[in-house]
Structure formats: C-alpha cells, structure tokens
C-alpha cells in the first residue's frame, strides 16, 4: 500500500514545480500550465496540491522540509527554482528541525523509500518505549505538517499577493515556449528555452525582472544583424520565415501582417529590460518572394537568412543537439532584385494608367574639384550607371555649373532606382538628388533608395588598383583564344577617366555584396553617355515636352514614349525607350531605320511580316533579364527551360536564313537583324538534349538531366537510394516472419512512409516486438515503425540530401556552361528587340494622318498640317493642324503671341515633338514634313522656384536661359516661353528683347519665342530678311465689348495686341464682383495708355513738321505705334 501510494504521489505536481520556472518535458504538462492563467485558478491549484500532498499514516516520514521535496522526477532540462526565505517564526521552526535532525536517537519513520536503508542491527525497544516513541514522532510530524502548510501559505502570498500577479502567472506559463522554432527538432527547441531568473532580493511585492538570457536563435539573429544593420532580415525558422525586433515592426507595417510585441532593439538596451523576447512577425515559406518584392518596392534593403542544414543531415551529424546553422544568403534592393521573372512593377506595369516604367539602373556618382562659389561654382562629376537585369553600363565624366543642369539631364535620362554617392557631394548636388528621389511623386515615378560610401584621399590610386586586380583575375580565367579580347577589354576599362574609375571600383564592391559583380565582365555594353551621335534632350526638355511621363499625373500615359510604344516584348520596350531618349544624328542611319519602318508598314499583309508578328506575340518571357539571371547563376529550372525553348522557337522560325540576303526583305537593317536569330539554334538544341523536359517544367531536380548526362556523384547517390529501398522491400519478408503473416505491405499515413499496419483485434498484436515504435493508430488498426526501417529511412534521407546537393551543383555547372554563350544569345535577343521596335514604329506609321519625313542636311523644320502627337490621341475632338517653316536660310525664329489658353504652348511643343519623332525614325503626324538634323532641343517653359537653394522663380528662369545661351548652336531648336514675366514690365521686356535678339542674330539657332509683350514685335523690323517673324494664335471676339472670345487654335501672321486674361479669369470662376472691378480697372488703364501713346504720336508729328529731318524713320515708328493703338 505504501509503495503504490508513493508512486501515485510521484505523478502529482509539486509546489516547487508550480512556483519554479521549469520546463515541461511533455506537451500535456505544457498545455496544462498554459490553461491556468488566473488568480482563482492558481488558488484552486494550490488547494488541490495541498489536498494531494496530505500525509498518510504510512508515509508521514516522507515529508521532511519543503527544501527537500523531490516527489516528481526532474525533466530533461533542470531549471533553478526560487528559494524564498521565511520570516523569524519559520526560521525558528527550521532551527528546531535541525536540532531534531542532529539528535543521535532520532528515529526515521518507515516508508517505501527508507525501509531498505534501515540498519538491521538497530536495538529493539520494549513495547512501552516503542509506544512513547511513536507518540513523540506523531507530535513532531504534526508540528512539521503545520509548519509546512504555513510555509506554503507564505509562498502563495509572496508569489501572488504582489502587484502584477496575474501577468506573472500568465508569463510564467507561456514564456518558455515563446521563441522556440516551429518545425525544428525537439532538441533545438529545448536548447532555445529561457532559463528562470535568479531569485529577487528585493522587498516583498517587488516586480520580478524579465530574463535577459538570449536563445541560440536570438544570438544568431543579433550576430547577422550586427553585420548588416541597414537590412531587414528575413530568417528561415522551420517552415516559416520570421522577422525580429525593429524589422518585425517595419515588415508588419509594409506587409499588413501581425507583429507580436516585444523588444525592438538589438543592443540589449536597458529601456527594454522588462521585455524577455524580441518582437516578431512571420510569413510562410512559399510566400517569401511575394513579400520580399513588396519590401524592396517600398525602398528597403532586405536580407534573406536561410538554414544551411537540412533535418536529415543534421540528425546524422555530430551537432544534432545544436541549433540549425544559418547564414545570410541573399541581399536585395530595388536595383538588385533579379531573383524573379516578373519585374518589381509587375507584368502590366507600363499600362495606360501606370506610373512611368523604372529602368532598374543603379547610379554611382562622385564629385570633386569644386571651383569658385555662388553662380560661378564649377564641379567635376563622374557617374557610372549599371542595369543588373540587362548588363547595360553607362558612364560619363563632365563639368557642371551651379544649377547642376548636366547632372539633372543625365539623371532624368537614366532614371535610376537607386543612388550610390561616393564621399561628400556639394550641397547643390545633394539637394538635387533629394528633390528627384525624395518622394513617391518625383520625376522617376517612385521613391528612390540612396546609399552613401566614404571616399579616402587616395581614392583614385586605390580604385585603379582595385579595378586592375578585378579584371586581371577575370583574364586569368579566360581561355587562350579569348586573351586578345580580354586585353582589349582591360585597356578599355583602365582608360576610363579617373572619377569614372572611382565609381566603377565602388560599384564593383557594392554589387559584390549582392553576388552581381559578374555584370562588369560584359564590357561590350560599356557606353559613354555623352556620345555626340545622338540628339541631346536635357532634363528640362524631357519634362516640358513630356517625353517619358506627363506633367499632370507623373504617369506614362500622354507621353511621347506612350504614343510610340506598340512593342510586344519587355526587352523591345526597353530598347524603344532608349531610342526615344536618344534620337539619331547620322542621316544615313536614320534613313535606314525609316526605310525599315516603311517596308514593314507597306508589307503588313504579307506572310513574312505576319511571321514576325506571330513570333513576337509568342515571346511571353523577358529573355534579356532571364539570360542575365542564367549568367548570374540565379535561374530556376523551369525558367531555363522556358528560355531555351523560346530561343529554339525564335531560331527555328528563321532557320532557313544563312545570311542577311536570305531574309527576303529589302531593308538591310531588317535582314541583318533576322540573320542573327538562327545563329544560336545548334547551341540551344544541344542544351535541350541534356535535360528532361517534363522534369524541368515540374522543377524536379532529381531527374532534371537525361541519364546519359548525369554526373558520377548523382549516379552514386541514386544507386545508394535504390540500395536502401531494396533493403526496405527485403525487410517486408522479415516483418512477415515476425508477425507470422504471409505478406506485409507498407502503408503511408499523414506523410509518414513505410508504416506496418496491424489490426488491433488480430493475433499479430501480441507478436509485435517491444522495439517497434507505434506511430499512429485508429480503433481498428495500429501503425508501427521497426527500428530497422527507421535506420534505413534515415540512411535514405541522407542519400536524398546528398543527391539534392549533387543535382544543384550539376545545374550550376550547366548554367556556367550556357554563360559562355552569353554573347551570341544576347545578340539574338537584341536583334529580336530591334525587330520589335521596328514593328512598333510601323504600327504608329499605319495610323491615319501620319507621313514619312524627308531629311535635310541643314537645320530646317518645314511642316505642313502638323499636329501634336499626344494631344491628338487624347482629344475626343479633331485637332487643328498648323504649318511651320523654319530654316537657317530663311526665317530662323517665330515670335508667338496670342490670348491666354489660345494654344501657344501646344503649338511650340508640337513643332519640337515632330522634330524628335522624325529623328527617332518614326513617321510624324503631318501632311508633309522636311526635317533637318538637329543636335539638341532646349526648352525654358513654366514657372517654379527653388526654395532649397534660395532661388526665386525669376532667378531659376534666368539661370536656365543662361545655360541655353551657352550651349545652343546653329543646329539647335530653342523654345522660350514668356521669358521676363517674373519681374517688372520694363525689366522683363528689356531682358526678353535682348535674349531674342542674341538668339537670332548671334547664335542663329531655330527659335520659338512665346510672349505677351506686344512691344517685342517691333524687333522683327530690325531683321529686313525676315529672320524673325511675328505670328499669333487666331481668335474671334463676340459679346459686349468683345468680352467673349472663341479660340481658333490656328497660327496666323501678325501680332495679337491683347491677351484676354480677364476671359481666363471668368473661365476660372472668379467671383463676378471681382471681375466687374477688374474690367473697370482694365478699361481705365487701357484708356490711360492710349492717351499717353497719342500724346507721344502728337509730339512726334510736331517734330517732323518742325524739323523735317529723319522723316522716314520717325514716320515708320509712328505708324507702328498707331498700329498698336
């Protein structure tokens, strides 16, 4: 009876197990703890334990002191329990106990535990003595029991009576499992549990301090975070990816996921000492790239931390009880995220209503040798822009003035998604970068990430040495047949300007962090920005003419690029964007491009053009980006299959073309492009023959290669797996003999394989060996794993993990082999992109009202019936065409006047856009057009200030005008809109007249000058050969005093002497009371000016009559004044 009672007590929870912060060794006890989370439940539990621990007559001797309770055997992980000292009464009682324990004649009560340790030679007392001893023992036990209960009560008061007792209970029951890793083995979970804190020495009721001991997982996260403090870490933990600390808060905000509160800082700051775990958030494994893309799109730098060990290999290793080894495997930013076939903006990013397309360029910039100050400041700037997704590299070195117009022009052309600034840049440059990248509504259409790196005083020498060693290492890895090309490559790179070399070195180091430094091997695509083979469109021109995005919504709809974009492929679209921003200057090249567009337009219904259209429509993947992902070794198996099959489709379509003459077109440009397509056919077919198409499509790495192409390592591991599976099949016979059955079959349940199923009611249940482990069961059957099967399954899993590693290694080898063919593959894709652009321009040319332009050698714009290309497509009504005639031999400038909202700005933009379209190689919206080779288009339109630089609207206006006067040439087109309006009338007229005269007389560039100063029309009289003509936008007056006007939007000869600003005020719904006053004041001022002019005319006439000298010149001036009246 005593033994059974003792065993029963061993199964009961002890007081110390409740108050001590212990770790449960089973899920059942953990759940029981978690359920008791209130004061009432805690008290109930104490009462239950008191009743359960009441001593029986046989077992009273077991209850010595509370310090000696040891009824429940310890769990796998011992946790120190708090030892709370008692007050004076308890101390005295304990002293009595000690005295009793030191008594030489103390008799220990018998129990199941102490019975066998009693000395057999103990003297036998008489019955009387024995009876008195029993009574004494009972008295002592009664007193001890009373003290024990009092001690228990004191513990209860100390534990629960203080402030915050309920949170303490809840925390104590749940904190131990807060940071264990889901999906990992039990050993690691136990290792990562918190350890109970040491007992507090504070007064009763003091709040218990949180544990500061870090789990192994937390230590791993902190170590990696310290190396990458600027990145948001996504940590693989079992079957989830988790965020910790501040990263979890940011991820929860950006991804709209739940963040469990906790510590945000990684430096163990005292302000978070009351928290014992990190804040955390989690996402499923299969949604990793979805959420990473969202974080990257928001401008964050994201690091992915993966487990480097698998469960099978870890279980077989020596560190099976250690946490999983983790390492940062990938870093992503907006410019370096190429691990997905879709772009960050999505497949339909460049739709009608989308933002302007991002180019994906990373731009590195350095600045040096600042000279002068104020308006005379000059800086030397070097830039290098890399597009990791395509391999394109742009570099330039130039000097810029205080307005930083050169930097702005390059930034607007390149449209980077990420900046890397080297060293300290000037204040003006820094503010320009902030202005262009600081918000989601900037000119790039999205927020831009900016990173900064330091620059030493010996940066030039260090950069040259670094770049030399980088390319020297590349040259050693090349074959002997490529040595000459490699040397040319190195010479080309080392001859770059010094500041560009500094940028190149910094960019190599930057991209090495993302494993993308191999992009610099592709130096064929190093291109200088400022090559004079293209028309220059500066930053103001790109914005004012809406080349890439409109000025209203900052989207691509309504831009010139949107108008011309009819491409079918993403790589064709990128090439067209480059064409739009860099119109040609070579007349012969331009003629070839337009001839190709004409042939495709005229042959639209022919089979050969239809074949091209069909081919382009079948290309659904971005081959240019996919090819570079192959080059980086980041391509997936299904993606590789798609690339190879698409290239095979392209090459097979024109496999009959052996030379450009076989293509069948008249245009040499088209024939040359088509002849590049079948070149890759043999290589593509050879690679396709190496892989299993069905396995590649299903992303099955184990059977990806054909059997004849598998490596020895793959074959060895497959044989090992086959051997183990054979042994598993053989064990079925052994199992059948054990169970005395004819046949045993394995079953799979809940994903667990090789289970042996036995009916519960059968005789075989009695024959199951004790070593067989029961895995699962139902009322009818039980399922077991014999130890032999478990060992074989473990061996099979190890072979599978080794096989997976061998398959990945072989796949990377295949990607490296394909990378050696990068150049011909890239040429094939580039040729298809060129054909896509030609087809797009042919689709534009096929629209009604578009005509092929004629090109002239001199600077000339002769357009009849021209229309605005974008406004025409957006308007529901018919666009009113206009004529333009400008040339170096005739009229070089037009002074455009007219009422507000009369169409002046639309007209001058129309002229510039037709010129740009013509030099892109496109048809233009006109009845006829003869265009010269313009080297640049400059614009000064709109009014805005630069508060950050302390520059007023008028200052910005004149600064931009100054840059135009310095850069314009006789082959440039210059558009100036209302120059001088930002100051007084007299100063504005003087400045406008001086600038216009300088443009026409000295620079002799083609000029369109918009003004409301009617006095400027007199300047045309100073050019007797008609170099400057006055034109105006026509309108008709109606209503009382001509207050109602109708815009005709036609260009006519002469000057408009009124601007009709009050009519615009009425259209803007200015209150009628204000308009009435404005009309009165306008009439008064107009009458006053007329009287003043009449007085001047009268005095002039009197001088003529009196003197009679210079009569012709004076009379001409008087007639002009009369005409203005």
From Swiss-Prot:
Instruction: Tell me the SUPFAM superfamilies matching this sequence.
Output: DNA repair protein MutS, domain I, DNA repair protein MutS, domain III, P-loop containing nucleoside triphosphate hydrolases
Start and end residues of each stretch annotated as Disordered: 1-212
| Primary role | Component of the post-replicative DNA mismatch repair system (MMR). Heterodimerizes with MSH2 to form MutS beta, which binds to DNA mismatches thereby initiating DNA repair. MSH3 provides substrate-binding and substrate specificity to the complex. When bound, the MutS beta heterodimer bends the DNA helix and shields approximately 20 base pairs. Acts mainly to repair insertion-deletion loops (IDLs) from 2 to 13 nucleotides in size, but can also repair base-base and single insertion-deletion mismatches that occur during replication.
Which residues lie in Low complexity bias regions? Answer: 16-33
| Compositional bias segments (type: Polar residues) | 101-112
Localization of this protein: Nucleus
Q: What quaternary structure, including any partners, is listed in this protein's UniProt entry?
A: Heterodimer consisting of MSH2-MSH3 (MutS beta). Forms a ternary complex with MutL alpha (MLH1-PMS1).
Is Cell membrane included in the keywords of this UniProt record? no
Name recorded for this polypeptide:
DNA mismatch repair protein MSH3
Q: Please state the protein's primary subcellular location.
A: nucleus
**Biological processes annotated in GO:** mismatch repair; mitotic recombination
Give the matching PANTHER family: DNA MISMATCH REPAIR PROTEIN MSH3, DNA MISMATCH REPAIR PROTEIN MUTS FAMILY MEMBER
Q: Which residues form a coiled coil?
A: none
Amino-acid positions noted as binding ATP in the UniProt annotation, renumbered to this chain: 898-905
Q: Where is the composition biased (Basic and acidic residues)?
A: 135-145
- Recorded source organism is Coccidioides immitis (strain RS) (Valley fever fungus)
GO CC, alphabetical: nucleus
The ranges of region (Mispair-binding domain) come to 208-335
Task: Kindly list the GO molecular function terms attached to this UniProt entry.
Answer: ATP binding; ATP-dependent DNA damage sensor activity; mismatched DNA binding
Keywords noted in UniProt: ATP-binding, DNA damage, DNA repair, DNA-binding, Nucleotide-binding, Nucleus
Q: Which Gene3D superfamilies match?
A: 1.10.1420.10, DNA repair protein MutS, domain I (3.40.1170.10), MutS, connector domain (3.30.420.110), P-loop containing nucleotide triphosphate hydrolases (3.40.50.300)
Acidic residues compositional bias, start-end: 182-195
- Family listed: Belongs to the DNA mismatch repair MutS family. MSH3 subfamily.
